[in-house]
């Protein structure tokens, strides 16, 4: 599964990062490199992006973090 496919399938869903619940949601992606995780608080280390990155963000959060797809697992509700 590519980052874009993962993003399209799981936008806004909560995910585990390396098996831990860190309060992250699927917010976007950066080409084939990273999934952008969004946080409702300021847990993430990124607050703003350039306009190029904003094109791939589907939902707005208070902070963000990059993650490799291989470390993510969607929490099924």
Feature names for model-found ranges:
Residues 76-77:
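Short acidic DE-rich linear segments
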Residues 15-70:
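Acidic, low-complexity, intrinsically disordered interaction modules
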Residues 1-11:
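Mixed-charge, Lys/Arg-rich low-complexity intrinsically disordered regions
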């Amino acid at each position: 599964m590519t980052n874009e496919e993962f993003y399209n399938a799981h936008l806004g869903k909560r995910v585990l990062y390396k098996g831990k619940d860190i309060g992250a949601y699927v917010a976007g992606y950066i080409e084939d490199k990273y999934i952008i995780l969004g946080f409702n608080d300021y847990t993430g280390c990124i607050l703003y992006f350039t306009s190029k990155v904003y094109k791939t963000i589907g939902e707005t959060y208070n902070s963000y973090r990059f993650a490799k797809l291989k470390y993510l697992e969607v929490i099924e509700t």
